[in-house]
Amino acid sequence: LFDEMAYEGHWRETLEFIAHAYKENSSVRSAMEGERNIQGFFTAYLSVNAYYLMAPEMELSHGYCDLFLMPDLMRYEVKHSYILELKYLSVKDTEEKTRTQWQEAVKQINEYAAAPWVRQLVQNTKLHCIIIQFRGWELERMEEV
């Protein structure tokens, strides 16, 4: 799965696999922790990936992106890099909150991608900006923006 992400830019299958694993391994208690729990789970899964240097909560453009997967170009000829923005909704949140949260995430991730030194960190790789929104432990929406 990680080969496809690194060399072909095919990220959906990998991230859906992790989202499914999160659902299968989560409990009501996990939902109480919300976004932090999701971030920890994704960080653990993605950290076993040798193609990238993981940077959770990296400061970019006056904010902190949830996960920045910087290519490890010293060891691999990776073609793609990623910024992941993770969002959590409770099962009781309204559709209006869902839409508002998504719009804010789009604004955030675009600001992160525009940060001056992001280009240096991703070098000549294609940067994918992906928002992953959960409702409880269910994947609500996942898109590249």
Q: What do the predicted segments below correspond to?
A:
Residues 3, 7-145:
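Structural signature of nuclease core domains in nucleic-acid processing machines
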